[in-house]
């Protein structure tokens, strides 16, 4: 398994890797493609989840709403 420094990972990717999940596995659990998960993690697109997908995301990542990052990808330049 490729090793990443914590600072190299987006918040969503950190959570996914912590659960030993691939982008494909997370995408399948949420009913989206692997490319969609990749785009979320890289900050190329913003997740638009249905309530069912949102609940599933929390469940598969084993996190609470409070633990979910406000932004899944990398912070924008405006955020510092």
Roles of regions detected by a PLM:
Residues 1-18:
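A short, Lys/Arg-rich alpha-helix, primarily the initiator
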Residues 13, 24, 55:
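Residues within the helices of the helix-turn-helix
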Residues 16, 27, 58:
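The alpha-helix within a helix-turn-helix
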Residues 32-47:
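Recognition helix of helix-turn-helix/homeodomain-like DNA-binding domains
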């Amino acid at each position: 398994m490729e090793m990443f420094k914590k600072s190299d990972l987006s918040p969503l990717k950190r959570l996914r890797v912590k659960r030993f999940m691939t982008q494909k596995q997370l995408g399948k659990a949420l009913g989206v493609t692997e490319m969609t998960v990749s785009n979320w993690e890289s900050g190329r697109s913003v997740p638009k989840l249905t309530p069912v997908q949102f609940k599933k995301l929390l469940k598969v990542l084993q996190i609470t709403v409070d633990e979910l990052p406000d932004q899944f990808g990398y912070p924008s330049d405006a955020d510092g």
